[in-house]
A protein has these predicted regions:
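Interaction-interface detector
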Residues: 1-137
């Protein structure tokens, strides 16, 4: 399956759909993004819609199956497509977080602790104190 993200006028992802791979293959069997875009514009009768292909297996610029990463991250509703970076970027979670230009993922100004946690524990970011808090549920 091939995934495509539909963008609004501000390049925000408003929907993500999948199409069978055969839809995006040309006469030589080579996948072409434009074929998928044309298919979706016709299917939804939206000739002016903006669609971008996205890879379900890509996160942080790494393809989970060892394939070629595509557009840094799999698109999700509410994410932004950045044409300069050719990447999908999640909304900034906290004002202090910084975009990693290589992964297009947001990072806290202080790395999350790497200590091993129990099953009922997790770390959460405390923006006011600029620190990670260990929480037990």
């Amino acid at each position: 399956m091939a995934s495509f993200a539909k963008l609004n006028s501000e390049n925000i992802v408003i929907t993500v759909v999948s199409v069978v791979n055969e839809v995006i293959k040309d006469s030589n069997g080579v996948e072409q993004e434009q074929l998928g875009i044309d298919f979706l514009k016709t299917l939804y009768n939206e000739p002016n819609a903006v669609w971008k292909q996205t890879s379900y297996n890509t996160r942080g610029g790494i393809h989970s199956s060892g394939g070629t990463p595509f557009r840094k991250n799999h698109a999700g509703i509410g994410m932004t497509y950045d044409s300069n970076r050719d990447a999908f970027i999640s909304p900034k979670p906290f004002n202090s977080w910084i975009l990693n230009e290589n992964t297009c993922l947001w990072e806290a100004p202080i790395p999350m602790p790497t200590t091993e946690l129990e099953n009922n524990q997790f770390y959460s970011w405390d923006e006011e104190n600029q620190s990670w808090n260990l929480t037990t549920i």
